[in-house]
């Protein structure tokens, strides 16, 4: 079952983490590469963020992977999909080279643009417009989203936090899970796998108006280091569970269209024609399928149970997403920091706006980091932060009396990524209002 002689991106990540003297030093180094880390005890979640250039193989694994730090090293608990790129997005040479070392066949696309790089069969998988939730085993079945270790984030609907709902994604998932599946489903799951679901729900709508809540299995991956971090087809695992349960459990799956590749169509980048061609086929697979759907993921198996994915979003979806998302300075800062602007940035004017935004953010972070380093060094010469942390913190606070953005400095001192991001959102919003909306 497992793929042989494959070194997965998460193994590159482990190798990189092991090169540092401590998790704290590793996290700090990754942060400078645009990889954010959320920490709960000995658990670490790695998620790419603003500024990640995706020029290292281990960057691909940082899409919500959760690892545990042990005395003997790092253990993978959950490993969702590797990073997959938007159609037409340029890939860094190291990433292209990595995929080419795994490929069955020669590359189709010589310009390093995300798309069908390989002359291999492909399938188009329905891209659901929901929330990715991963189920993994750690002394019991637990879940996380791609941005939260415990899935305790607030529900977002139409791009806005639904403050009227006293629920988290974790509560919404288990509530939906209990409605859709029998509780004994968990007994049929493989504890050496993590299960990647897409949760769609009227109360967590983005664009597509799903009328009924649902949980759809979109991916399965081994987290057994001895066998390898290979993927298992969702339909394959669904059939196994269906058979083992005597036909009592029927996992929901996304619509999948398998077809021979049309390289002329894709090389010409005529995506509108592609959607005109495949939308009726998808509608035939899913009864009552909406014409306006998010799009699809094009999947190619480039080595045994190793997949290369490209996401292609429906033009109408992109336009509706633009309309649904109120682009206030605060919302723009939020989308930018969450690395989600690629969902709707299309026009040259918008591309120019993003470039300005990057300049504003880079300037802001450089100023903050420079000030932090200066203050930290200055106070460290007076009192040791290790030997007398209380006095150090007191002097640190006094030194910040005249600073507008004290919360960022304390979050940076404590290594609290979530508070840093919250503070950065506030600061970036202020700078956007001055720099882009004046």
Curated annotation (Swiss-Prot):
Keyword Magnesium: yes
Cofactor comment: Optimum activity is reached at 1 mM and 5 mM for Mn(2+) and Mg(2+) respectively, with Mn(2+) showing 90% of the Mg(2+) activity.
Molecular function (Gene Ontology), one example: ligase activity
Residues where Mg(2+) binds: 342
Enzyme Commission numbers on file: 6.5.1.-
Matching Pfam families: RNA_lig_T4_1 (PF09511)
Main function: Involved in countering a host defense mechanism which, following viral infection, activates the host induced anticodon nuclease and shuts off viral translation. Repairs 5'-PO4 and 3'-OH groups in the cleaved host tRNA.
Stated pH dependence: Optimum pH is 7.
UniProt keywords, alphabetically: ATP-binding, Evasion of bacteria-mediated translation shutoff by virus, Host-virus interaction, Ligase, Magnesium, Manganese, Metal-binding, Nucleotide-binding, RNA repair
Lineage: superkingdom: Viruses
Residues marked Essential for RNA ligase activity (site): 198, 317
Transmembrane residue ranges: none
Active site: 127
Cofactors named for this entry: Mg(2+); Mn(2+)
GO biological process: RNA repair
Enzyme class name: ligase
Thermal properties of activity per the entry: Optimum temperature is 64 degrees Celsius.
Binding locations of ATP: 48, 63, 83, 198, 311, 313
Protein name: RNA ligase
Alphabetical list of Gene3D superfamilies matching this protein: 1.10.3550.20
């Amino acid at each position: 079952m497992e793929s042989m002689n494959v070194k997965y991106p998460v193994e590159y990540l482990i190798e990189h983490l092991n090169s540092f003297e401590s998790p704290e030093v590793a996290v700090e180094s990754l942060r400078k590469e645009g990889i954010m880390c959320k920490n709960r005890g000995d658990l670490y979640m790695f998620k790419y963020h603003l500024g990640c250039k995706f020029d290292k193989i281990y960057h691909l694994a940082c899409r919500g992977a959760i690892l545990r730090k042990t005395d003997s090293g790092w253990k993978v608990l959950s490993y969702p999909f590797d990073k997959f790129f938007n159609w037409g997005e340029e890939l860094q040479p190291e990433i292209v080279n990595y995929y080419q070392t795994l490929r069955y066949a020669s590359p189709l696309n010589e310009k390093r643009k995300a798309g069908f790089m390989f002359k291999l069969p492909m399938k188009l998988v329905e891209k659901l417009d929901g929330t990715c939730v991963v189920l993994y085993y750690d002394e019991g079945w637990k879940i996380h989203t791609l941005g939260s270790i415990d899935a305790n984030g607030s529900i977002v609907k139409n791009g806005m936090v639904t403050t009227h709902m006293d629920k988290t994604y974790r509560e919404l998932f288990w509530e939906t899970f209990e409605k859709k599946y029998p509780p004994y489903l968990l007994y049929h799951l493989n504890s050496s796998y993590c299960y990647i679901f897409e949760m769609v729900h009227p109360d967590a709508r983005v664009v597509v108006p799903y009328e009924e809540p649902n949980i759809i299995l979109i991916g399965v991956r081994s987290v057994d280091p001895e066998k390898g971090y290979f993927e298992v087809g969702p339909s394959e695992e669904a059939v196994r569970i269906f058979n083992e349960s005597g036909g009592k459990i029927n996992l929901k799956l996304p619509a999948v269209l398998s077809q021979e590749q049309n390289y002329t169509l894709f090389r010409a980048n005529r995506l509108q024609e592609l959607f005109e061609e495949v939308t009726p086929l998808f509608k035939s697979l899913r009864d009552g399928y909406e014409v306006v759907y998010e799009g699809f993921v094009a999947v190619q198996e480039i080595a045994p149970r190793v997949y290369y994915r490209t996401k292609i979003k429906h033009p109408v979806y992109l336009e509706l997403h633009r309309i649904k998302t109120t682009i206030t300075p605060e919302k723009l800062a939020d989308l930018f920091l969450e690395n989600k602007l690629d969902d709707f940035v299309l026009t040259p004017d918008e591309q120019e706006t993003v470039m300005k935004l990057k300049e504003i953010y880079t300037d802001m972070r450089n100023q903050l980091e420079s000030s932090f380093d200066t203050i930290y060094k200055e106070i460290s010469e007076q009192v040791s932060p290790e030997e007398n942390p209380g006095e150090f913190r007191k002097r640190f606070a006094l030194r910040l009396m005249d600073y507008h953005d004290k919360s960022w400095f304390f979050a940076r001192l404590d290594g609290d990524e979530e508070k840093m991001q919250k503070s950065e959102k506030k600061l970036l919003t202020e700078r956007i209002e001055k720099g882009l909306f004046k």
